[in-house]
Amino acid sequence: MRNHCLELSSNCSSIFASSKSNPRFSPSKLSYSTFFSRSAIYYRSKPKQASSSSSFSTFPPCLNRKSSLTHVLKPVSELADTTTKPFSPEIVGKRTDLKKIMILGAGPIVIGQACEFDYSGTQACKALREEGYEVILINSNPATIMTDPETANRTYIAPMTPELVEQVIEKERPDALLPTMGGQTALNLAVALAESGALEKYGVELIGAKLGAIKKAEDRELFKDAMKNIGLKTPPSGIGTTLDECFDIAEKIGEFPLIIRPAFTLGGTGGGIAYNKEEFESICKSGLAASATSQVLVEKSLLGWKEYELEVMRDLADNVVIICSIENIDPMGVHTGDSITVAPAQTLTDREYQRLRDYSIAIIREIGVECGGSNVQFAVNPVDGEVMIIEMNPRVSRSSALASKATGFPIAKMAAKLSVGYTLDQIPNDITRKTPASFEPSIDYVVTKIPRFAFEKFPGSQPLLTTQMKSVGESMALGRTFQESFQKALRSLECGFSGWGCAKIKELDWDWDQLKYSLRVPNPDRIHAIYAAMKKGMKIDEIYELSMVDKWFLTQLKELVDVEQYLMSGTLSEITKEDLYEVKKRGFSDKQIAFATKTTEEEVRTKRISLGVVPSYKRVDTCAAEFEAHTPYMYSSYDVECESAPNNKKKVLILGGGPNRIGQGIEFDYCCCHTSFALQDAGYETIMLNSNPETVSTDYDTSDRLYFEPLTIEDVLNVIDLEKPDGIIVQFGGQTPLKLALPIKHYLDKHMPMSLSGAGPVRIWGTSPDSIDAAEDRERFNAILDELKIEQPKGGIAKSEADALAIAKEVGYPVVVRPSYVLGGRAMEIVYDDSRLITYLENAVQVDPERPVLVDKYLSDAIEIDVDTLTDSYGNVVIGGIMEHIEQAGVHSGDSACMLPTQTIPASCLQTIRTWTTKLAKKLNVCGLMNCQYAITTSGDVFLLEANPRASRTVPFVSKAIGHPLAKYAALVMSGKSLKDLNFEKEVIPKHVSVKEAVFPFEKFQGCDVILGPEMRSTGEVMSISSEFSSAFAMAQIAAGQKLPLSGTVFLSLNDMTKPHLEKIAVSFLELGFKIVATSGTAHFLELKGIPVERVLKLHEGRPHAADMVANGQIHLMLITSSGDALDQKDGRQLRQMALAYKVPVITTVAGALATAEGIKSLKSSAIKMTALQDFFEVKNVSSLLV
């Protein structure tokens, strides 16, 4: 059994040793004597009794509190009685009266609702099917494991509206509805279905959370009253349903700032912090519009208070357990999804933790969540310990996924089983196989989660953090101390940091005013501002006063700065084995040490290994090593004992995609999971390495072994050295593992490690790193295309500003410019003249020989095509799917709607595409997946835009459109199977039409323009399937949240380049009964064509103008394309923002407008018909092909 005590022994720390061994590491040089203080986790004397957070028996001395919480909080006995009446024994235990259960998914990935609900939904489907229930699933997101046809018995990939869900209920007749696995989307749907009478009409029971409990937790007024009933405090507040009511509440509270929280919304959408009356009015308007019940809570600000969360579970026998405590490093005022969080809570005494635990149990009982998981959020005053209850989520949440991965306790799986009658003591713990789920998890490590942001994708928006969530992803890391897990989590973000500090960061060049502002005002880079402030000599007390980040955390961070300073004061050769162990125990990466000692990462690694300083791997076991863990879920540390125990089976290491970001999201995790499933079926042990807590890939039972580690070359090579797998797969995780392909290959070529199975050397499976580089290196790729006689747009590689201007002059404007080696169109732009090109080169990118910029002719008015193809190691190539984009070329493929099969492309063009794709796959020696993008001009010329010999974000969509799991096939061909073995030898062209539409987070980023371009900005996608394109497109728009009007007024404002299409667009909407209004130039064009149109003023032409019509509800659909004129650009931007604020559908491309007209025509002529995925094609059982 491992030692629970994480306190470092002074005997093993040479930094504490006498100056005789190494004078540079003398204690006398420390800034204070507590340099290497103990972790916040202490030895627990009664682990069986305590929960994950109850181990903190000693209160950190640096906390600025006048007293303990004891005198402030009521004893448990003083809480109002919330015990429930005993449950009747006949309903405790698995229910046999239920046969069919419907699960509501979460829909597309949006900010505030991401992969974690695929994780929870997948767990729920598996858990219920294990128990023999028939599962019906509704979800519009194709990039999910839960929507695979084998996950549920009946799968509907369709819009999630009350009317369409009711249609499925009528058709499938489920006995029960489980709404707690799909986030806010599912909860709101369940409430709507219950209140409309649909559930009662068809005899459907809500399980997991009853209607009363959902409303009591989600309705701000009911929740406030409930807390009052049990004697718990909430911030002084009031409920407003109109703007006047909101101002009345503000008057009563009496001071700014004020927090505005809309009811029944996701990720704080529509809410915020108001510091004055103008901001208050704006946020209240937004919140009232965003709330499903037009209700907002206006409450006193608790800015600067500490924030904690507890994950709670309750069963039908009224057993309640606390799964995990979570502490936000950022104080109140920052949405918990945007805060750096730590589990278990680090700055609570045991007594304080027990109080919050008691409150959580009282709350879940008062709200009435009979069974399942809930998340409770607390605010604690750092001065006197006063506690306020912030909110409660009566469902599986983002924090639930984090708590599940942090503890190994599968909250969603347990919640699903509890919903059908099981009690916690009746469900075994999968990890220990000896303890029941009623044992509260105990953990002997620290977990840190850090959010990832994408403000650079939304120019014009302010990079500030408030109560409205804005992060697009997150990383998580585990370590034996906070310092270790924090540094690992930071380098897991893949934002250019190898840890905290030991790097050239912009904040070091800031003056004191800039630094103080960044410390005071929450922003994505505040943690780096803390580093810069400490480096510049700012004291902990001052940083605390500015940031309100707890002094315990600041003390821990200051120690890291001191370690960095020690490293910088000497050379690598001076560092002893003991010194290196102490530095690595604090999470410092080889790259950080190299920076500090002015050496290279490879030199540090060589020295470290020569000294025998290698990581050990610990198991996540839910019980702090009290019982053996049977599931190999590992994290690295520089502790003594290694618990990994690798074996000599045939095995494959799969590198995941890391944290979600725009351009690399759930689609790549989907591919990684399918790879693992397929190779397990083929008899391989699969090993997953990833750092994203939201995903299915990091579920402990997705692969045979899981390493929760950063995706850096250091951490990956450490696992390779330990496991020595037969193969390493880099093709499925997006750009993250691809960047590691060449360094891994160089390492394998140099050291030639042999696999533990004895089958030969460790090697990268699939397409070679050299072929990947050939496709991404522009000069090599151009040479290949010239050899194969494949056409591409005219262009060149610019290594200076002069090069770029010369290429643009040669090919002619407009041109597309972008840096090489990017994903998601990062820093890609269309420019129309020299001045804009110069501006781009000065502001967006650095151009030099080391960082060339690609300059290509922009093919305006061309149609873009996406092709996913599959190639085996025998040279056989099969087209997986050819997708036609609805938006013209120039809009990033990830942001464009697309359809499969193609609808308007001539057969000759399709044949050219098939021929070129096949030739290229063979030339690059592709083994696995490849994605190619083409453009077809109006004259029928075909051009190849780019090729990526890896899995693309369209693979899940294509797989579900054609009924073949392409990622599984790709994994199997890498293992040596042929496409003939898999019975996949020719392109499948389905009879039905599938449409994929992108979903955008514009409402979260006020001030940014919603117009689409070559830089990807969508966070997720939806899919629909129908017999005709028009109905499939309409369904996709509804699923994406676009409420298409069936009548009313259409506003048109088109630039000169798109006016040739204007007549067709206007006639299409007139024939549907719409009225047309247009700005002067557009109206003049239509009048010349004899088309009835009403003129409306542009914003700079006077009042009433187009924005007034939007505000007055006189415009129901808008088409605005951007022109080069500065005033028109400003007007168009403001109108598009106005449309977003008033929820008016806005279209920014001609093709999108024409498709929308077709979709509206379909909606007016016939009702949407819901069809299960299993009715379109037979479910493919890949394992049967391997027999």
Curated annotation (Swiss-Prot):
Pathway: Amino-acid biosynthesis; L-arginine biosynthesis; carbamoyl phosphate from bicarbonate: step 1/1. ATP 2 binds at R818, K857, L859, E864, G890, V891, H892, S893, Q933, E946. Expressed in roots and leaves. It comes from Arabidopsis thaliana (Mouse-ear cress). Mg(2+) 4 binds at E946, N948. Mg(2+) 2 binds at E391, N393. The lineage of its organism: Eukaryota, Viridiplantae, Streptophyta, Embryophyta, Tracheophyta. Mg(2+) 1 binds at Q377, E391. This is Carbamoyl phosphate synthase arginine-specific large chain, chloroplastic.
